[in-house]
Amino acid sequence: MTEAATSTVIRDATQADLPAMAEIYDEQVRSSIATFETEPRGAAYLGEKLAHPAPGDFMLVVMRDRVVLGYAYSGPFRPRPAYAGTKEVSVYVAAAARGQGLGRMLYAALLARLDALPDVHTQVAVVALPNDASEALHLGAGFVRVGVLREVGHKFGRYIDSAWYQRLP
């Protein structure tokens, strides 16, 4: 468990956290391009990720005063075996808690765990554009922007580009 301030805690997610995590994610689905989901997924979606982790798959929450304010996770980049050393990472923070450094804290904890695994070589993150805050978060966590895929998503009546970020040892 990592404590960043007196009442801010980062820890492994549990089943009890899933409703709050789903609320954070589903708000992003409904109101932003941070995810290309177009319909809310609910707690069952995140529960599947939590219940069936592969080696190097982590799901962390950040809490303040016992309230889940965000989460980060790592998962497979692609299903083929040769990609096993590459993890895709994501972070989501509740709208009311953004700008407080919680995403940075979550990534620091998540990336430290991944760095400790000899079989995990690199991490990849995908950022829908424009998103200055997310791009700054990834650059600050040691990621490098390696490319942009143009107009690969369609949400809210428009096409959206995705920037690809990679973090190497």
Enumerate the language-model features and the residues they cover.
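A short beta-loop-alpha structural element at the N-terminal edge
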Residues: 9-21
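Conserved GNAT-fold acetyl-CoA-binding loop/helix
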Residues: 22-49
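Acetyl-CoA-dependent GNAT
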Residues: 39-96, 107-108, 113, 168
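Conserved catalytic-core motifs of GNAT/GCN5-like acyltransferases
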Residues: 73, 81, 124-126, 139, ...
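A structural signal for short, well-ordered beta-strand segments
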Residues: 89, 123-125, 165
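Conserved beta-strand-loop-alpha-helix junction that forms the acyl-donor binding cleft
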Residues: 98, 124-135
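Conserved acetyl-CoA-binding loop-helix of GNAT-fold acetyltransferases
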Residues: 99-114, 135-140
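Conserved GNAT acetyl-CoA-binding A-motif
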Residues: 114-127
